[in-house]
From Swiss-Prot:
Pathway named in the protein's UniProt entry: tRNA modification; N(7)-methylguanine-tRNA biosynthesis
Pfam families on file: Methyltransf_4 (PF02390)
Gene Ontology molecular function, alphabetical: tRNA (guanine(46)-N7)-methyltransferase activity
Entry's family note: Belongs to the class I-like SAM-binding methyltransferase superfamily. TrmB family.
Enzyme class, broadest EC rank: transferase
Protein name: tRNA (guanine-N(7)-)-methyltransferase
Function field: Catalyzes the formation of N(7)-methylguanine at position 46 (m7G46) in tRNA.
Keyword Transferase assigned: yes
Active site per UniProt: 146
HAMAP family: tRNA_methyltr_TrmB
Amino acid sequence: MTESNDTPIQPEAGDERQHRRIKSFVMRAGRMTEGQQRGLDQGAPLYVLPLADAPVDYDQVFGRSAPRSLEIGFGMGHSLLEMAAAAPEQDFIGVEVHRPGVGALLNGVLTQGLTNLRVYDCDAIEVLNRCIADNSLDRLMLFFPDPWHKSRHHKRRIVQASFAELVRSKLKVGGILHMATDWEPYAEYMLEVMNVAPGYRNLAEDGKCVPRPAERPITKFERRGERLGHGVWDLKFEKLA
């Protein structure tokens, strides 16, 4: 999940590439398993959505009106599959640029026969800007994004003031931005960004992090980290207006 997010940071003025948006993901080639290739071959025509030039009518896409969540950077798709299977009354949209991950998710969708999940295999910020109508999402999830540890790479982090504002514009009033990270300095950084972002309320009682919500599945990576004494920090912010 850590290499698939995108951030709307702009290069500094005077940069010869200032027309290009700095991205927080790095495209890496990955070897496809048989199942992942099956997912792409059979699932993509059914479940992968193209970038649109106008907001998409997801009621038409899903054939119903239902609570709608979007996850940026779903990695291999295990958590998103589990959430979609556990909540058939809700609709889910996943965004991921890593092709093996997209294939793995789609293979799971086919195997489980899910109908409440659709996928974009492209830049998440492009999806938000071009496809998602304002005030339309009930929840946006960002689990374990790349923290870009080095200071000179912090500009690549997806969580920035401009990202918070873009997400706020897409959430319904009362909608939730749910983030999780396994690196405490990034959790602190997220808090710094969100605490000054207008139009949000931190749902943590202590104004910091919330206990792990039951609706967020625990990944194998997270379980391994827990055995080693590593922490995970969940942050939830509600859109006020």
